[in-house]
């Protein structure tokens, strides 16, 4: 039974998602369908929570829009999420940043981690295509022998 669940989850799991953490400022690109057209809409904010694992993993992004705090929950493996860009990384000492809900202005700022390389979405795509190509070459060479 457990094996069957893993097979179904593997079918829907996304591989090309950047490894972001709590406190990171991210830009989530969401697919919006309007009539027969599809477009991408960016939602930029701070990751205040990550929960679940596997295909059920979700995260909450909080931003301030026109002076009002707005939080949105995203499922990491949702087909509506195109990709996630990491804008900046912050130094935090908590697993959940729910206390930011009560902070306003400068008190809600997080200290930025300096000297940390921020991965880009294009680098991730290059790495996954290179890994897939090398895996395909290994399969071809092993089947040729």
From Swiss-Prot:
Which domain of life does the UniProt lineage start with? Answer: Bacteria
Signal sequence coordinates: none
Family annotation (InterPro entries): Ribosomal_bL19, Ribosomal_bL19_CS, Ribosomal_bL19_sf, Translation_prot_SH3-like_sf
Its GO CC terms are:
cytosolic large ribosomal subunit
User: Which GO biological process categories is it annotated with?
Assistant: translation
Which keywords does this chain's UniProt record carry?
Ribonucleoprotein, Ribosomal protein
Q: Tell whether Ribonucleoprotein is among the UniProt keywords.
A: yes
Q: Please verify whether the record's keywords include Ribosomal protein.
A: yes
Q: Which family does it belong to?
A: Belongs to the bacterial ribosomal protein bL19 family.
Q: What's the stated role of this polypeptide?
A: This protein is located at the 30S-50S ribosomal subunit interface and may play a role in the structure and function of the aminoacyl-tRNA binding site.
Q: What is this protein called?
A: Large ribosomal subunit protein bL19
This chain's source organism reads Brachyspira hyodysenteriae (strain ATCC 49526 / WA1)
Gene name tied to this protein: rplS
């Amino acid at each position: 039974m457990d094996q069957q669940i893993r097979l179904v989850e593997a079918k829907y799991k996304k591989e090309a998602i950047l490894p972001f953490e709590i406190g990171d400022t991210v830009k989530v690109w969401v697919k919006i369908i309007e009539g027969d057209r599809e477009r991408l809409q960016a939602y930029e904010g701070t990751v205040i929570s990550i929960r679940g694992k596997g295909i059920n993993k979700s995260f909450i992004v909080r931003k301030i829009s026109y002076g009002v705090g707005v939080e949105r929950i995203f499922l990491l493996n949702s087909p509506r999420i195109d990709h996630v860009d990491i804008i900046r990384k912050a130094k935090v000492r908590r697993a959940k940043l729910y206390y930011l809900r009560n902070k306003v202005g400068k008190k809600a700022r997080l200290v930025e981690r300096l000297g940390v390389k921020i991965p880009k979405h294009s680098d991730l795509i290059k790495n996954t295509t290179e890994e897939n190509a090398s895996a395909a070459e290994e399969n071809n060479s092993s089947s040729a022998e």
